[in-house]
């Protein structure tokens, strides 16, 4: 079974594709490739284009409260290269269609475990 940490990697980490070179169809391709269009179209998802070590390091940066009230969220000191994928209104499962938006924002992730690693993407600010 996929662990929470593995799920985070699959859903949110894309260290290979460099921002600025992404095509408008990036989200359509990646959401499909990373299994986020199985059974339904995941409405919103964010990919982070930074080295994995830099994403994991966020777990040791600024401690903030998560959206659900938990206290195990951490905000990145720096703004990171991210891509937001959002379903477009005309999109209908199984033909999931996404708008690709490239941004530079601080990320907030929930971390847990030993080693202490990201397990949930909480927000971009």
Curated annotation (Swiss-Prot):
Disulfide bonds join 27-85, 41-96, 59-111, 66-73. Pfam families: RnaseA (PF00074). Belongs to the pancreatic ribonuclease family. Its EC number is 4.6.1.18. It comes from Spalax ehrenbergi. Endonuclease that catalyzes the cleavage of RNA on the 3' side of pyrimidine nucleotides. Acts on single-stranded and double-stranded RNA. This is Ribonuclease pancreatic. The keyword Secreted applies. The lineage of its organism: Eukaryota, Metazoa, Chordata, Craniata, Vertebrata. The keyword Transcription does not apply. GO terms for cellular component: extracellular region. PROSITE patterns: RNASE_PANCREATIC.
